[in-house]
Structures are given as structure tokens and as C-alpha cells.
Amino acid sequence: MDQQPERREGRSFPERKGQKRKLEEGAAAVEDREISAVSTDGGQALLSEVAAQVSVLNSAFSWQESDRAAAKRATQVLAELAKNEDLVNVIVDGGAVPALMTHLQAPPYNDGDLAEKPYEHEVEKGSAFALGLLAIKPEYQKLIVDKGALPHLVNLLKRNKDGSSSRAVNSVIRRAADAITNLAHENSSIKTRVRVEGGIPPLVELLEFSDSKVQRAAAGALRTLAFKNDDNKNQIVECNALPTLILMLGSEDAAIHYEAVGVIGNLVHSSPHIKKEVLTAGALQPVIGLLSSCCPESQREAALLLGQFASTDSDCKVHIVQRGAVRPLIEMLQSPDVQLKEMSAFALGRLAQDAHNQAGIAHSGGLGPLLKLLDSRNGSLQHNAAFALYGLADNEDNVSDFIRVGGIQKLQDGEFIVQATKDCVSKTLKRLEEKIHGRVLRHLLYLMRISEKSIQRRVALALAHLCSPEDQRTIFIDDNGLELLLGLLGSLNTKQQLDGAAALYKLANKSMALSPVDAAPPSPTQRVYLGEQYVNNATLSDVTFLVEGRTFYAHRICLLASSDAFRAMFDGGYREKDARDIEIPNIKWEVFELMMRFIYTGSVDITNEISKDLLRAADQYLLEGLKRLCEYTIAQDITLESIGDMYELSEAFHAMSLRQACIMFILEHFDKLSSMPWQNELVQRTIPEIREYFCRALTKSTTNLQSLRL
């Protein structure tokens, strides 16, 4: 059920991200406007501009100041055009890649050249920048690398080695690192080639560079190179990058600690041995500190990394909590940033695999925000919240808190996007159900007695769904839980009515599992059945009934054995006692014939059309077996439109099984009945009978359970 969020590679497109780039004053500003005009003009003007700049690069590879100035401007123009992704194809097709490649290195130095090198490092910087922008497509990444860019870019990373230190040196190193980042982005083969070309050691060294932008660029490149590449990860660690990266976690520069935590996260991902080294190197507390960073990206990466630290093969779950991670993680659950909430829920879900952490997270206020996230329409966020709640449900100390904050209703009523989340929620409810006994149940009963009304109702609702059948009588009869549910059912609040009805329906089904009553009743045991051949047969008949002017031949011995009504008729002081012919008024012939057929055979086929008249006759003549068969037949035909009439019928003829079926129908279909204008009146009318039914059913089910155990 645990699903780790995907890590993402970084990519360095600073200008595409809206960061401002400083342009040289004067003519450079004018040139920039000219470039913008070309890029928006398109067509032939663009092709001509690209061709012109490529021609300059191909012809200006020397230390002459005019060549250096022209080459610098050409790289700037191409880079400016490449910021528009729609123009990249035109630039590459125009031959820009090999031309820019040439200028990744300084031109050869001749004896006649000046001692001072004009625009030193700046042309190389511009070339690296432009090539990085062109690496927007995988095929262009490969083209640039196949042309031999990597060795030159790696050499640019070492420009500070000759002792020179200037803004230009810093810039060329940074652009080289950014270009490597973009070339290797989501390209495993190029990541490997960077390592083979020796790119990782200088990048690790640059983590300690004095210029913060260079540090950030180096960390960004290492982050990309470490992503899903085990050999690169191992070399980064072997180059002793961890101590510096951990120091960078504490930087006040958000951009630096964001890249640093990203590198560490990619190193740790799917690499248990590196995770162990990272923890040994002291990363835990700085990462926890980033949870309170002003940078949401750093917070997100830190939460994800803590979730990785707390995976099932780790023993540091408790340490993470002890060092103060829980409260900031819970605060992050309430952020407007969806990804921040997702990573926080992920981390808490991992931490909640420890029993003491489960109690601590709930005690610190984690339950409410996690339950709220179940309303999210983001499937990944919803699932991570559900998984965290699944962990918290494993601790008995949290069960009452789940119920007190309305967690059971939240889990039951939620609309979950993916099947994995639905399964997780089902398992959470099952886990909670298994814990409602012993001290947990005693605590809940205590809350149901002394808490404010809203809490009492939540407890009663939860117990109706989750309690064991053997505890139903204690909870709902002895401790008044039934009255709380009936109070909800009789409420004027529709939501409360629906919750009460659903809980009562669940409770009824549980009790019926031990005392099933919805199956078709068997024929009653009777001492005398003469058989089908004696139905309306004059043979040995000693009494006849006159029904609608027709004669029905019967036998006293069979009638006496069938019901108290006939025994009173023939053995009591009524005039029918000695009569040979008895008139039966107010009953149809077909109804009387079916009633007598039941008396003679113990069974009869009952149709919907005749069932109500037959029920009336069965009630009049006290034929309980026939009455139950009629009630069962009628109950199969209950609808939203007929439920009111059916309930009246059950009252008129003391039809207890039919009345129970009506009650169950009302509870099961309460949401649909709520739109009926007469619904509220019907509910209020049935509440006394519902109370009586549950008192009878819960007492009976408990007795049955006890007898089963004996």
C-alpha cells in the first residue's frame, strides 16, 4: 500500500524560468532588442541571422580582440534565440552546434598575440550557455555529446585551477555545470559518459567553491547525475561529497540547501548502503531543520528524504520523531502547496510504522489534517494520507481519537480515486474494528456516557459499524447507544438522519447474522395434515363452509389441529360448535380455498395479487404459519412508493415479520426516501417500533451467541 512519490531531476534553464539576466549596457541592450525582433519575425530573417552568427563563430577563432568580441556577441545572439524553444530546431539545423563546440575551448595562443587575453573565459561561457539551451531534446543532447562537448565542458569546470579568480571564471564554470545538467537530464547514457570523462570529481570539488552560484550549479549537476545511476552515486560518495553536502543543508541561501537536499535524496533513493552512510555522516538533524525552511521546495525534498530514511529497512523512525520532525510535518499537511502536503503525508506514513510514533503523531494533532486530505482530488496525495491513517490505526491509543474527530464517518463516506486507496481505507476500518474490545471499548463507552452530545453520537455511530456482535447488547441496550442512534434518526438534520439510518441498518444486519429472519419461513409443525386429496372433498367430511354461495367440504379433526380460532369455533360456546353448515362472510372464495389448502397440506403458492387478502384471513383465523408466508411474499414487493401502505398493513394485521421488513427497507433506502414529502412523518411513526425491534433483536442475538458458545 505504501507508494513512494517519484523524485524528479533538476534542469538548469535559468532564463526560461524567468530569472533576470544582466546584459551589458549600451550597444548590448540595442543588440538584444534586435535579436528579439528576429526571433519574432521568423522565416528568412531568422535563418539569415543564425547563418550569420555561425559564420562569425567559424571564422573568429583567435585571440584578436575583434574576433573575441565578435565571437562573444555571436554566442549571446544564439543563446538569446535558443531561449525560445520553438527556434531550437532552426538553430541546430543552421549548424550552430559544431560552431559553438569550437569555442568551448580557448583559441591557440600565437607569438604575435597580446599578453592580455581579451574577453578571457567569456566566449567559452557563452558557448556553454547556448549549448545547454539547445539540449532541450534528447536527439540534440546526443548530437552535442557525440560532437565531443563533454571533455571541453569538464575542462571548463577546472578553469579555477590555474590560480585565476574572477567573475568571468566563476561564470564560465557555472555555465559549464549547467550545460552538463541539461545534457544529462533524463539521459542515462550521457550521465555515464560524464562520469567516464571525469566530470564528477571536479563537480564535487566545486561544492566548496567560494561563489554561491557555482556551488549551486555544481550541486544541480550532481543531483542530475545521481538520479537513477548507481555508478554515479557511488563515485559521488567516494569523492567525499557527503560532508560538504551536509554542511550545505544548513546554508542560509535557500537555493543552495534546496540543491543539496536534492542531491542527497537522489543518492539515497534505492541505495540502502548510501542511506546508511548519509545518516552516519550526520544528515538527519539538518534535514529535519529544513522542514521549517522558508523555501517550499526544500521543505518538500526534506520531507521526501525523511520518508526514505524511515523506510521499513531503517531503524531511525523513532530518532526522526525524537529530533522534532512531527510538528513541522503536521504543519506542512495544511500548506496550500499540494506537493508539500503529499511529501509530508508520505513521511508521516513511513514514521507511522512504529507503535510509539503512531501515538505521538496522533497526540500532536496529525489525525485531523490527514483525514481532511482524504477530500483531495489528487490521487497521490489522497493515497499517502490514507496510508498514514492506516499506520495510525494500528495503535489502540488512537482508536478513540479516530472516533472522537469523526474519522470513521470520513473513512466510510470518502470518495477515493484509485483502487489502492479504497483497499487501504477498507483495511484501516478493519484494523480499527479489530481493536474495539477490552480497554478500548471501555474507553469508548465512557466517552459515550460523559462526553458532549456530538461526541456521544460519533461513538455510537462508530460502534454500530465496528463493534463485535457479542458487545451489541452492552453498548446499545445497557449503555443507551440505541437511544443516541434513534435521536439521530429523528433529527431534523438530513445528514444526521442518514448517518443514524446507516448505523441502524448495519447494526440490524449484524444481529440478523446470528438470528436470520429474512429467509422464507419453513412450514410450521402441525400434528394433522390430511393431504391434498382431502381438500374440499366430501369423503368423511363432517362440516361444510358456505363461502360466496359455494360449498367447501372440510374435516373438523384437521381444523381443530390448525389454530386456536378453529378450536374455539368447534370446542367453545359458539353456535358453530354443532352446526353442519357454517357461513363464512367477508372472504373471497379463492382466498378461503388457499387458506384451507394450507391447513390440509402445510404449504401453498401465494401470489402478490392475493397475498394481502390471504394475510387478513390468516390473521383472522390465527394461522401463524400461513401469516408468515404471506408476510414474506408481501415483503418482496416493498418499494419506495408502497412502503407507507405496507407499514400500515403490518400494523393492521399484527404482521411482525412484515413490519420488520418495512423497518429494514426504510433504514436501507433512507437516502432515497428522504426526498418523499411524507418521509419524516413515516420515520417519526416508526421510531417506537424500531426501538422495540432492536431491543428484541439485540437481546435475542446475544442469547443466541451465548448458546452457540455453550
UniProtKB/Swiss-Prot annotation:
Phenotype seen when the gene is deleted: Abscisic acid (ABA) and glucose insensitivities. More efficient germination and postgermination growth.
Pfam families with a match to the protein in the record: Arm, BTB
Keyword Electron transport among record annotations: no
Location (main, coarse): nucleus
Induction, per UniProt: Up-regulated by abscisic acid (ABA) and high salt.
Chain intervals for the UniProt region annotation (Disordered): 1-35
Keyword tags: Nucleus, Repeat, Ubl conjugation pathway
Subcellular localization(s) per the UniProt record: Nucleus
InterPro entries: ABAP1/ARIA (IPR044282), ARM-like (IPR011989), ARM-type_fold (IPR016024), Armadillo (IPR000225), BTB/POZ_dom (IPR000210), SKP1/BTB/POZ_sf (IPR011333)
ARM repeats: 85-127, 138-185, 188-227, 230-269, 272-311, 314-353, 355-394, 429-468, 470-509
Keyword Ion transport: no
Tissues expressed in: Detected in embryos and most of the vegetative and reproductive organs.
GO BP annotations, alphabetical order: negative regulation of seed germination; protein ubiquitination; response to abscisic acid; response to salt stress
Every BTB domain range: 541-608
GO CC annotation: nucleus; plasma membrane
Listed pathway(s): Protein modification; protein ubiquitination
Domain commentary: The BTB/POZ domain mediates the interaction with some component of ubiquitin ligase complexes.
Biological function: May act as a substrate-specific adapter of an E3 ubiquitin-protein ligase complex (CUL3-RBX1-BTB) which mediates the ubiquitination and subsequent proteasomal degradation of target proteins. Acts as a positive regulator of ABA response via the modulation of the transcriptional activity of ABF2, a transcription factor which controls ABA-dependent gene expression via the G-box-type ABA-responsive elements. Negative regulator of seed germination and young seedling growth.
Assembly: Interacts with ABF2. Interacts with DUF7/AIP1.
Protein name: ARM REPEAT PROTEIN INTERACTING WITH ABF2
Organism, as annotated: Arabidopsis thaliana (Mouse-ear cress)
Upper taxonomic lineage: Eukaryota, Viridiplantae, Streptophyta, Embryophyta, Tracheophyta
Gene: ARIA
